[in-house]
Amino acid sequence: MTIDDDLSRIAEQEKVLSFDAFDLTTAWQLGKLLQELATERGLGIAIDVTLHSMPVFYAALPGVTPDNVNWVRRKRNMVLRYFRSSYASGLKLQKDGKTVEDNGLSGADYAPHGGSFPINVKGSGCIGAVTVSGLPQRDDHNLAVEALALMLAKDLDTLRLA
């Protein structure tokens, strides 16, 4: 797939993977679902669900390093800044031949890499982010999308990046 193909598919993901309502219980359920998927698959990832600026769920599974904590924070910052997935932001920067620094941001605080996805509520927009770190960035992104699709009973095959 080309960057444009991925950006188009991610835009569709961000549109389709929107909740009617989302609260602290839903946030915990999303984090727990990701933890269960990762554990079943033996994935060493860090998982974070944040609403606004409030951490709701965090898990570090075997294989995670202290670096993953920082990657989670930096990827989440991309979502909370641009209200779109960190992977889409990174692909757009790559397509335009730019970096986060070109937008006046610090690479120490913003990571335009896959793995953080906006938590969107219909009629409200982005209220937080779900973030995965520990796999290659495309896999981090796909895992977050998979969990959202499962929670929202959406067809993952039509949403997943190839």
Curated annotation (Swiss-Prot):
SUPFAM superfamilies: GlcG-like (SSF143744). Pfam families: HbpS-like. Signal peptide: none annotated. Gene3D superfamilies: Haem-degrading domain. It comes from the Bacteria. PANTHER family: PTHR28255, UPF0303 PROTEIN YBR137W. Belongs to the UPF0303 family. This is UPF0303 protein RL3365. It comes from Rhizobium johnstonii (strain DSM 114642 / LMG 32736 / 3841).
